């Protein structure tokens, strides 16, 4: 009897340890000694991290009206004014794509520093306030358009909070989803057959779609729900796991939508991206602070293209 009880206790202790272990390293996605590090503070409200091919991080400070640069040591101004940019991503040619709140448009920064407007209206009406974007291998740019950043005194002109795609060849803007409350972060699976879109409005969940020809979405379903806070920025790693911002930090889900674990962060991250010299650092923009943690994985899109998928 005593032996049976001892065995039972041992089993309970071992399984509790295993659970603790799997939560701390996220089933091997993080090194065992990985720790959240604060890289910079004193910012206003930061969003949209993107790792530039030149080897530094950019991110938006929305109220400060600047895109910032973190060079591994210091934070400086990368572009100002930014028209209160929010989400940033990198295209296949290494160019920075930015979603502007007060500009109510999506822009691309060319190699000479000039900006090209990629989208600012749909059916003759102003966009709401583009929030986040992702670029497909063929160059099609997908972005979300909730109304969070419409400047005071201006009106919402669109009848929906759309998810849009800018066709790589024709440059035409297509509404690909109109039934989101507040569509926000988005990312592709490694094979680009699935698109994940966060809804940071009432549903507080992430939906997944099959990507069909002619940039249309099919078979939409709920992928996962966020239990604390809302899903804002999301990223996919090379194995198809989804890393989502949430109220208490970052929540990581398997390709089947099962919660693998959480990374707790002192401030609530609004967005995240993979980057660093080897692509294995996860950067998190969290209110007034920029944070990072080392991982054992990379973004679905690889190292020098922003790791943004
Ligand atoms: Mg966002």
Go through the PLM ranges and name each one.
Residues 19-35:
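Blade/loop signatures of beta-propeller domains
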Residues 271-309:
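Blade-level signature of beta-propeller repeat domains, shared across WD40, Kelch, NHL, RCC1
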Residues 56-77:
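Beta-propeller domains
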Residues 36-40, 74-79, 116-123, 172-177, ...:
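A short beta-strand motif characteristic of beta-propeller blades
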Residues 66-68, 105-107, 162-164, 205-207, ...:
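A short loop-to-beta-strand structural motif that recurs across blades of beta-propeller domains
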Residues 209-216, 295-301:
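Short loop/turn segments immediately following beta-strands, especially the blade-tip
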Residues 143-158, 295:
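Short, conserved, GDST-rich strand-edge loop motifs in beta-rich repeat architectures
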Residues 40-56, 81-100, 104-105, 123-143, ...:
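Beta-rich, blade/repeat-based domains predominating
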């Amino acid at each position: 009897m005593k032996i049976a009880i001892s065995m039972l206790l041992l089993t309970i202790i071992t399984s509790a340890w295993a659970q603790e272990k799997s939560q701390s390293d996220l089933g091997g996605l993080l090194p065992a000694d990985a720790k959240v590090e604060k890289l910079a503070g004193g910012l206003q409200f930061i969003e949209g991290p993107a790792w530039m091919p030149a080897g530094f991080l950019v991110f938006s400070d929305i109220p400060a009206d600047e895109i910032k640069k973190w060079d591994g040591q210091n934070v400086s101004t990368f572009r100002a004014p930014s028209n209160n940019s929010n989400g940033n991503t990198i295209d296949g040619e290494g160019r920075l794509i930015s979603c502007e709140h007060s500009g109510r448009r999506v822009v691309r920064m060319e190699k000479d520093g000039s900006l090209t407007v990629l989208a600012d209206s749909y059916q003759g009406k102003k966009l709401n306030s583009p929030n986040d974007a992702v670029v497909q291998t063929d160059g099609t740019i997908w972005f979300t358009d909730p109304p969070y950043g419409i400047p005071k005194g201006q009106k919402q002109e669109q009848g929906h909070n759309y998810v849009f795609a800018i066709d790589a060849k024709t440059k035409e803007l297509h509404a690909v989803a109109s039934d989101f409350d507040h569509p926000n972060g988005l990312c592709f699976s490694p094979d680009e057959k699935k698109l994940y879109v966060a809804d940071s409005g009432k549903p507080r969940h992430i939906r997944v779609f099959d990507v069909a020809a002619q940039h249309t979405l099919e078979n939409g379903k709920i992928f996962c729900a966020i239990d604390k806070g809302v899903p804002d920025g999301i990223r996919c790693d090379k194995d198809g796991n989804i890393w989502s911002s949430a109220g208490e930090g970052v929540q990581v889900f398997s390709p089947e939508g099962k919660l693998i674990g959480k990374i707790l962060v002192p401030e609530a991250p609004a967005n995240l991206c993979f980057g660093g010299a080897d692509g294995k650092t996860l950067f998190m923009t969290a209110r007034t602070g920029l944070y990072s943690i080392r991982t054992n994985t990379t973004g679905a899109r690889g190292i020098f293209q922003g790791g943004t998928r």
